[in-house]
UniProtKB/Swiss-Prot annotation:
Keywords for this protein: Amphibian defense peptide, Antibiotic, Antimicrobial, Cytolysis, Disulfide bond, Hemolysis, Secreted
Cystine bridges: 27-33
Family to which this protein belongs: Belongs to the frog skin active peptide (FSAP) family. Brevinin subfamily.
GO cellular component terms listed in the entry, alphabetical order: extracellular region
Signal peptide interval: none
Source organism of the structure: Pelophylax ridibundus (Marsh frog)
Protein name as it appears in the record: Brevinin-2Ef
């Protein structure tokens, strides 16, 4: 249903945000930004 779709969208968006945060953090830590 609609709720399931929204939940899946939220999960996907959350994963994307987490991944970009991790990438930024590791890039800054390694000084490769």
């Amino acid at each position: 249903g609609i709720m399931d779709t929204l939940k899946n969208l939220a999960k996907t968006a959350g994963k994307g945000a987490l991944q970009s945060l991790v990438k930024m953090a590791s890039c800054k830590l390694s000084g490769q930004c």
